[in-house]
Amino acid sequence: MIEAVLLLGFAIPLWAKRVNQFPPGKEALVVHVVAQQFSFNYHLAGPDGQFGRRDALLVTNSNPLGLDPNDPAGKDDIVTTGELHVPVNRPVIAELSSKDVIHDYFVPAMRIAGDAIPGSLIPIWFTPLKTGTYEVICAQLCGLGHYGMKGTLVVDTPQDYQAWLKERAELSGGAQGAAPSPAPGGPQQPQPQQSKQPAPAASPSPGG
């Protein structure tokens, strides 16, 4: 009994320190994860490294994140729904938020989880160690369609990740094509996302 108490007494603070010790922003891939009933939206900065401005007043079905088409910083951004690609062996900082109710971003195979709460920005981080396709689910009851709130996290080789970024940019013309604004003369309509079936679970990554 004493041994168990001592183990927990040392392990919990060390694990908390590990989880909360975020990698430097320049080393990590920063992704904005915006949950909504009943899907996860992903927002990545383009080659300029800057995220475009978002405005709740611009949110529509075709522009789920409310990206401002007049903001130059967002012209090269990438927005996807349901599927996120990340490079293997590179830290990922996922900044979680929600448009409606409380959700929970959960990657079971990697033991990554974090709440997405309206009005809050909650960061979590992890380092994917193996390439593959992993299931993403919402672990918080969020409405009648909760059972179908699923997606995929694809861990690519660095080469495949760069190819995916190039493909997304060519298909959508940056975020302005993937998530257009209703303003006159705005960007193009979003391109359909290709879904992938989850692969067998891989060993979990540290952090999260």
Language-model-detected regions and their locations in the chain:
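Non-transmembrane, membrane-proximal soluble domains of secreted or membrane proteins
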Residues: 1-208
